[in-house]
């Protein structure tokens, strides 16, 4: 993982601890929703939460937009994005502050997982 996305010494944890936290989150989501979510389902859930308009039917394009909102929200936790405005329909728009560093697929997945753990810990504790 890139240095500017590492959580810092106060958050150092073993890979096993990280995986345990991740699996605990998935288990909690499975308990709440009756199905174990994948990364895309969690991104969609976060996007719906950030939109704040409750459960609704969304088009395929809206679902992609919700996942983009989620990604921006997650990476705002590490200073890469900030909420710029909410449009007249209530959809949030984020401004890129600094690029998210290049990462291969496995690193990207780990970055998303780490940010999701932070999101659910910060926003739901």
Predicted regions and their residues:
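Amphipathic alpha-helical interaction segments
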Residues: 36, 50-53, 73-86, 119, ...
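Amphipathic protein-protein interaction modules
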Residues: 58-108
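Helix-rich interaction surfaces within compact, conserved domain-sized segments
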Residues: 98-125
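Structural motif
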Residues: 31-39, 56-66
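Short, hydrophobic/amphipathic alpha-helical patches that form generic packing surfaces
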Residues: 41-54, 66-77, 114
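N-terminal low-complexity, intrinsically disordered segments
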Residues: 2-51
């Amino acid at each position: 993982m890139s240095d500017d996305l590492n959580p810092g010494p106060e958050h150092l944890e073993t890979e096993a601890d990280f995986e345990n936290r991740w699996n605990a989150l998935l288990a909690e989501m499975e308990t709440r929703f009756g199905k174990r979510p994948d990364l895309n389902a969690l991104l969609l859930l976060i996007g719906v939460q950030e939109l704040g308009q409750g459960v609704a039917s969304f088009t395929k394009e809206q679902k992609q937009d919700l996942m983009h909102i989620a990604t921006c929200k997650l990476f705002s936790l590490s200073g890469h994005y900030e909420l710029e405005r909410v449009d007249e329909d209530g959809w949030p728009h984020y401004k890129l502050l600094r690029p998210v560093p290049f990462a291969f697929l496995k690193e990207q997945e780990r970055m998303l997982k780490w940010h999701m753990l932070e999101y659910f810990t910060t926003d739901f504790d």
